[in-house]
């Protein structure tokens, strides 16, 4: 039963790029993306605050669902649409502050145990990864594959879900066929020979999400 402690999100968030710069946020929102995440790693809050402010402003301009990865204090301060946290961040984050600020919350998971932890937090959506091998970041876990992803989707029923990890234009239809609500992509766009064409193809496949 989908009864989060945080504001709800649509079951289908559509194509969900995860990018590390405001420039990419602007490009992709201009290209029609409506769900996006700014993920800048290993910097102090004061080093990323200007980028967070700019990204949130772009999200508002395009009426997009803009999630900030990790920097939850800045997301609250500048009123982002939502925050995305990894498992390792859950214990050190003031979830009640995010909830009180009215921000949505997404949580990463990699196995059944982490799904249990995520469900206990009652977030707005649950991310399931990594589906395929990925070069984007070092992963301690093995790729889950489509069968495991489908099993998690069955378990989570009406909970909004996002698949992530090694998803390419070619693999996207099979990922969506598991019933997952959304697909998050990184290198499929940012490392594409023609990012505009890749984005257009992925939007055709995954859509922009439900209202």
From Swiss-Prot:
Cite a single GO MF annotation.
thiamine-phosphate diphosphorylase activity
Enzyme Commission no: 2.5.1.3
Query: Which residues does the annotation say bind 2-[(2R,5Z)-2-carboxy-4-methylthiazol-5(2H)-ylidene]ethyl phosphate?
Result: 134-136, 166, 186-187
Family annotation (Pfam families): TMP-TENI (PF02581)
Q: Which InterPro entries match?
A: Aldolase_TIM (IPR013785), ThiamineP_synth_sf (IPR036206), ThiamineP_synth_TenI (IPR022998), TMP_synthase (IPR034291)
**What reactions does this protein catalyze?**
2-[(2R,5Z)-2-carboxy-4-methylthiazol-5(2H)-ylidene]ethyl phosphate + 4-amino-2-methyl-5-(diphosphooxymethyl)pyrimidine + 2 H(+) = thiamine phosphate + CO2 + diphosphate; 2-(2-carboxy-4-methylthiazol-5-yl)ethyl phosphate + 4-amino-2-methyl-5-(diphosphooxymethyl)pyrimidine + 2 H(+) = thiamine phosphate + CO2 + diphosphate; 4-methyl-5-(2-phosphooxyethyl)-thiazole + 4-amino-2-methyl-5-(diphosphooxymethyl)pyrimidine + H(+) = thiamine phosphate + diphosphate
* Keyword entries, A-Z: Magnesium, Metal-binding, Thiamine biosynthesis, Transferase
Q: What class of enzyme is it?
A: transferase
An example GO biological process term is:
thiamine diphosphate biosynthetic process
**Which pathway features in its UniProt record?**
Cofactor biosynthesis; thiamine diphosphate biosynthesis; thiamine phosphate from 4-amino-2-methyl-5-diphosphomethylpyrimidine and 4-methyl-5-(2-phosphoethyl)-thiazole: step 1/1
Question: Could you give the cofactor binding note from the entry?
Answer: Binds 1 Mg(2+) ion per subunit.
Which residues bind Mg(2+) per the record? 70, 89
Q: Which residues bind 4-amino-2-methyl-5-(diphosphooxymethyl)pyrimidine?
A: 37-41, 69, 108, 137
User: NCBIfam families recorded for this chain?
Assistant: PRK03512.1, thiE
- Family per similarity comment: Belongs to the thiamine-phosphate synthase family.
State the protein's purpose. Answer: Condenses 4-methyl-5-(beta-hydroxyethyl)thiazole monophosphate (THZ-P) and 2-methyl-4-amino-5-hydroxymethyl pyrimidine pyrophosphate (HMP-PP) to form thiamine monophosphate (TMP).
Its name, as the record gives it, is Thiamine-phosphate synthase
Organism from which the protein derives: Salmonella newport (strain SL254)
Could you tell me the gene encoding this protein? thiE
């Amino acid at each position: 039963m989908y009864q989060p402690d945080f504001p709800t999100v649509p079951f289908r968030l559509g194509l969900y790029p995860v990018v590390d710069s405001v420039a990419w946020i602007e490009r992709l929102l201009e290209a029609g993306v409506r769900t996006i995440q700014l993920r800048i790693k290993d910097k102090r809050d004061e080093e990323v605050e200007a980028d967070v402010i700019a990204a949130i402003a772009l999200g508002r301009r395009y009426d997009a669902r803009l999630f900030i990865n990790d920097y939850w204090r800045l997301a609250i301060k500048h009123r982002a649409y939502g925050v995305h946290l990894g498992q390792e961040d859950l214990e050190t984050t003031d979830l009640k502050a995010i909830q009180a600020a009215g921000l949505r919350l997404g949580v990463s998971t990699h196995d059944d145990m982490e799904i249990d932890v995520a469900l206990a937090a009652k977030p707005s959506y649950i991310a399931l990864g990594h589906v395929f091998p990925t070069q984007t970041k070092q992963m301690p876990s093995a790729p889950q594959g489509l069968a495991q992803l489908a099993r998690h989707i069955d378990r989570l029923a009406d909970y909004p879900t996002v698949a992530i990890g090694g998803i390419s234009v070619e693999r996207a239809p099979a990922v969506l066929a598991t019933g997952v609500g959304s697909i998050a992509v990184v290198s499929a766009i940012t490392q594409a020979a023609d990012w505009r064409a890749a984005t257009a193809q992925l939007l055709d496949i995954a859509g922009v999400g439900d209202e």
